Curated annotation (Swiss-Prot):
The chain crosses the membrane at residues 38-58. Residues 59-607 are virion surface. Pfam families: HN. One of its GO terms (biological process) is symbiont entry into host cell. Glycans are attached at N149, N309, N391, N422, N456, N587, N603. InterPro entries: Hemagglutn/HN, Sialidase_sf. The lineage of its organism: Viruses, Riboviria, Orthornavirae, Negarnaviricota, Haploviricotina. It is a single-pass type II membrane protein. GO terms for cellular component: host cell plasma membrane; membrane; viral envelope; virion membrane. This is Hemagglutinin glycoprotein. Attaches the virus to cell receptors and thereby initiating infection. Binding of H protein to the receptor induces a conformational change that allows the F protein to trigger virion/cell membranes fusion. The cellular receptor might be SLAM, and may explain the lymphotropism of the virus.
């Protein structure tokens, strides 16, 4: 009987397990032949992975490029949206506001105007109603078959508007050249030089008269906003007899136009000659708004009566338009309407100006009211120090111990009312020169510059600020001082005890330029040089600068009259000057009228 082990061995005798050692050898043999296949599989896997990575990179690049393009397009869209937003805010919103204003505000106003127009048209055909025909449209073209009772108002208003429309281009050209600064810039570090030139007046009426043997005396010129005006006494050569009976009063007005080399040209457009028997020995002048106005008297001092007992004399009023043959050319004697306290006024050959259809002049006035303020000013100033004026017992121009006041003459030029000369007064700095006052318009203030000329080489003159409104005031500006000994509103003009310069034979008026900076000019007839000369002094008190320039004369003589009127043209100072002198060689009197130009320049400027 076989044991267990023998049974097992017999079972596996023909089985593979019995040859297990051989089988293992065969298995090792087969395992040795597998590595090439594995490497091939691994290589394929590696290639697949690299392909996947390449595909992934390409896709990533495409996605990045797509994102960048999308970002660019998005940015462009945002910029376009922002531009549209700004267009809406900056353009459409204001446009909508304008449309809203037009529809909500102006359209109802226009409809209301149309309604009023229709009502006025309808009213013209109502014969039972009276109308005011002062509207220019009804003056020019009244309805047919309607009887209209016209006055001079329609003619004057229509002519004035037509003239203003025609003259506007000339005035604008002149104004654009008359507001500059004549001085070099503040950066000037070198020497300032001045160059002067003299020009004749070729197309002026007065020059044509001077060129003949006729004599012109006491010429007065005023310039305002591109318009000039003159008045003077003419002694024709064909008249014989007493000199005083031969004087003819002449007025002229015209434009300041641009001429050759852009220089100004005073072109006469209208003039008026008063008959010999007219009361026009002494005349003021005012120019503005295309009009000349003048007040004329036979005697400078005018007595004013306030009751019916006195016979009040009239003052001759002359108005002249820029063009002739219009209702604005008129001569009329007017009875003045003075303040009850004004007893006398002193009219001289001095200038004013026209503003808002009102001609205004300044004159010395004698008033009956107590002058305690002025007297106290003098008494307190003279207690401790002796000023030259402290020894005066008579005051110009009226004489006697009463100080003159400041008088203002206003003449409304409204064609709808009659001419009326109103006289008011106020107090101010003490007046030492009674020859007269010039009144210049201030382009920046609701007032004017009141100037009193120097006199006899001892009084330097005076420049005050005078208001134009109903509240008439005079405030000192330059060439005055407040004495330490006095208190309150006390101002005195500068005066010296002796003549400061004996080589100065005569002095002109003080002229304030129509510039933004306060600048004034004065001229003198000087004999200190080898040749006689007219010397100009230009002052700017605010910037504390001043310049001089001398125009040497080819003649020598003794002057008895010197008058200037200055304006700015292309940043240069231009002055119209008129002077009379008695020639030393012939003892004959000669009148000279011309234009002078002073150009200031700087040698070098700071960078």
């Amino acid at each position: 009987m076989l044991s267990y082990q023998d049974k097992v061995g017999a079972f596996y005798k023909d089985n593979a397990r019995a040859n297990s050692s051989r089988l293992s050898l065969v298995t090792e043999d087969q395992g040795g032949r597998r590595p090439p296949y594995l490497l091939f599989v691994l290589l394929i896997l590696l290639v697949g992975i690299m392909a996947l990575l390449a595909i992934t990179g390409v896709r990533f690049h495409q996605v990045s490029t797509s994102n960048m393009e999308f970002s660019r397009l998005l940015k462009e869209d945002m910029e376009k949206s922002e531009a549209v937003h700004h267009q809406v805010i900056d353009v459409l919103t204001p446009l909508f506001k304008i449309i809203g204003d037009e529809i909500g505000l102006r359209l109802p106003q226009k409809l209301n105007e149309i309604k009023q127009f229709i009502l006025q048209k309808t009213n013209f055909f109502n014969p039972n109603r009276e109308f005011d025909f002062r509207d220019l449209h009804w003056c020019i073209n009244p309805p047919s078959k309607i009887k209209v009772n016209f006055t001079n108002y329609c003619d004057t208003i229509g002519i004035r508007k037509s003239i203003a429309s025609a003259a506007n281009p000339i005035l604008l050209s002149a104004l654009s050249r008359s507001r500059g600064d004549i001085f070099p810039p503040y950066r000037c570090s070198g020497a300032t030089t001045s160059v002067g030139s003299v020009f004749p007046l070729s197309v002026s009426l007065s020059m044509s008269l001077i060129s003949r043997t006729s004599e012109i005396i006491n010429m007065l010129t005023a310039i305002s906003d591109g318009v000039y005006g003159k008045t003077y006494l003419l002694v024709p050569d064909y008249l014989e007899g007493e000199f005083d009976t031969q004087k003819i009063r002449v007025f002229e007005i015209g434009f300041i136009k641009r001429w050759l080399n852009n220089m100004p040209l005073l072109q006469t457009t209208n003039y008026m000659v008063l008959p010999e028997n007219s009361k026009a020995k002494v005349c003021t002048i005012a120019v503005g708004e295309l009009t000349l106005a003048s007040l004329c008297v036979d005697e400078s001092t005018v007595l004013l009566y306030h009751d019916s007992n006195g016979s009040q004399g009239g003052i001759l009023v002359v108005t002249l338009g820029i063009f002739g043959a219009t209702p604005m050319d008129q001569v009329e004697e007017v009875i003045p309407v003075p303040h009850p306290s004004v007893e006398k006024i002193h009219i001289t050959n001095h200038r004013g100006f026209i503003k808002d259809s009102i001609a205004t002049w300044m004159v010395p006035a004698l008033v009956s009211e107590k002058q305690e303020e002025q007297k106290n000013c003098l008494e307190s100033a003279c207690q401790r120090k002796s000023y030259p004026m402290c020894n005066q017992t008579s005051w110009e121009p009226f004489g006697g111990g009463q100080l003159p006041s400041y008088g203002r003459l206003t003449l409304p030029l409204d064609p709808s009312i009659d001419l009326q000369l109103n006289i008011s007064f106020t107090y101010g700095p003490v007046i030492l020169n009674g020859d007269g006052m010039d009144y210049y318009e201030s382009p920046l203030l609701d007032s004017g510059w009141l100037t009193i000329p120097p006199k006899n080489g001892t009084v330097l003159g005076l420049i005050n600020k005078a208001s134009r409104g109903d509240q008439f005031t005079v405030i000192p500006h330059v060439l005055t001082f407040a004495p330490r000994e006095s208190s309150g509103n006390c101002y005195l003009p500068i005066q010296t005890s002796q003549i400061m310069d004996k080589d100065v034979l005569t002095e002109s008026n003080l002229v304030v330029l129509p510039t933004q900076n306060f600048i004034y000019v004065i001229a003198t007839y000087d004999i200190s040089r080898g040749d006689h000369a007219i010397v100009y002094y230009v002052y700017d008190p605010i910037r504390t600068i001043s310049y001089t320039h001398a125009f040497r004369l080819t003649t020598k003589g003794r002057p008895d009259f010197l008058r200037i009127e200055c304006f700015v043209w292309d940043d240069d100072l231009w002055c119209h000057q008129f002077y009379r002198f008695e020639a030393d060689s012939t003892n004959s009197t000669t009148s000279v009228e011309n234009l002078v130009r002073i150009r200031f320049s700087c040698n070098r400027s700071k960078p």
